[in-house]
């Protein structure tokens, strides 16, 4: 049993019980020429830096495909997009500006795949079950699983996008099986190779994967630590990975615990407080994990652990291995 200190400030201390299989979706993407896509997809796929929001949406998708994650793709310029651009520029030997300047745009667009594609919804995509997720931990413990609350949330995680963006891209769509919708082209991105080490940078609020030559080849925005539970700086190691974890909840172990709560087992699922994967660190009670709130990554605080979007945490988990160095630095 592994104890952790890494949940959102509204939640409390949990202890990890690992299950073995990740949550998965059936996928069937149909890529089409831009001429066959709705006008918004055409505009985004042909966007130039001067095209403002269309260019930012295209850039976010290309950054995600290049493994410099902007977290939740929403088409809006913000701190996570700037971090992703900074990381991409550094990795590619470009001047670090945090902006979509011409050299950065040209480097991103070496990936010639369309940013937005048409996708045919499958029965598995909309099968659910979908149900509201209670905020109270004791109420969560009464559920069999902490799955998605809506088909839009499920599709948002599948395509690394905010549900609001999917709605904007697909006005009038009912999100029913057999329906074609426009989505970010992220499923076909290459898997990450194994890393030589992992670096967590507090000042940049990022987690990076570094190869044997010392080059950062993937970067993810993160939520980490707080005044009450600071990030445990130092040199640690990866202990292992647990996918689709369930938890034993112990309210006695957190400063913001609800005194009326009791110990309880919190079921697995994407809306579990640590999401769909836990990467265990040699520092007791600490790890890198997913989140039920991808829109808040890089914008809030944690109980000391390192929180990523579920899709970034899953991607990272496939590139690490037991014994790998994990450097947590200021």
Residue map of PLM features:
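Gly/Pro-biased beta-strand-loop elements
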Residues: 187, 193-291, 318, 322
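Bacterial N-terminal signal peptides that target proteins for export
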Residues: 2-14
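Compositionally biased, proline/threonine/alanine/serine-rich low-complexity intrinsically disordered stretches
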Residues: 27-59, 90, 113, 117
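N-terminal targeting pre-sequences for secretion and organelle import
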Residues: 311-330
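Extracellular LysM carbohydrate-binding repeats and other cell-envelope/extracellular binding modules
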Residues: 79-83, 87-125, 167-197
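Bacterial N-terminal signal peptides
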Residues: 13-23
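A short amphipathic alpha-helical interaction element
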Residues: 49-97
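Short alpha-helical segments in extracytoplasmic peptidoglycan/chitin-binding modules
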Residues: 60-63, 72-74, 84-89, 151-159, ...
């Amino acid at each position: 049993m592994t104890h952790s200190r890494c949940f959102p400030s509204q939640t409390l201390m949990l202890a990890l019980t690992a299950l073995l299989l990740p949550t998965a979706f059936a996928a069937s993407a149909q890529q089409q020429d831009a001429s066959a896509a709705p006008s918004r997809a055409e505009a985004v796929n042909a966007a130039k830096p001067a095209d403002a929001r269309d260019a930012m949406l295209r850039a976010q998708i290309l950054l995600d495909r290049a493994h410099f994650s902007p977290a939740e793709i929403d088409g809006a310029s913000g701190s996570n997009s700037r971090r992703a651009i900074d990381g991409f520029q550094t990795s590619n030997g470009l001047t670090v500006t945090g902006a979509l300047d011409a050299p950065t745009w040209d480097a991103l667009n070496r990936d010639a795949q369309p940013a937005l594609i048409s996708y045919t919804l499958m029965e598995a995509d909309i099968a659910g079950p979908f149900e509201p997720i209670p905020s109270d931990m004791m109420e969560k413990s009464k559920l069999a699983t902490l799955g998605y609350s809506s088909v839009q949330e499920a599709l948002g995680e599948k395509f690394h996008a905010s549900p609001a963006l999917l709605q904007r891209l697909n006005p009038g769509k009912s999100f029913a099986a057999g329906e074609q919708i426009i989505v970010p082209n992220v499923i076909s991105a290459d898997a990450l190779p194994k890393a030589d080490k992992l670096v967590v940078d507090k000042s940049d609020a990022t987690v990076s994967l570094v190869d044997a030559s010392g080059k950062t080849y993937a970067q993810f925005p993160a939520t980490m630590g707080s005044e009450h539970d600071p990030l445990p700086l130092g040199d640690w190691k990866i202990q292992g990975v647990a996918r689709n974890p369930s938890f034993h909840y112990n309210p006695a172990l957190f400063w913001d615990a609800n005194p009326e709560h009791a110990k309880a087992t919190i079921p697995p699922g994407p809306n579990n407080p640590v999401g769909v994967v836990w990467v265990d660190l040699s520092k007791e009670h600490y790890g890198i994990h997913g989140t039920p709130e991808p829109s808040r990554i890089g914008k809030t605080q944690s109980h000391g652990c390192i929180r990523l979007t579920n899709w970034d945490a899953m991607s990272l988990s496939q590139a690490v291995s037991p014994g790998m160095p994990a450097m947590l630095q200021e």
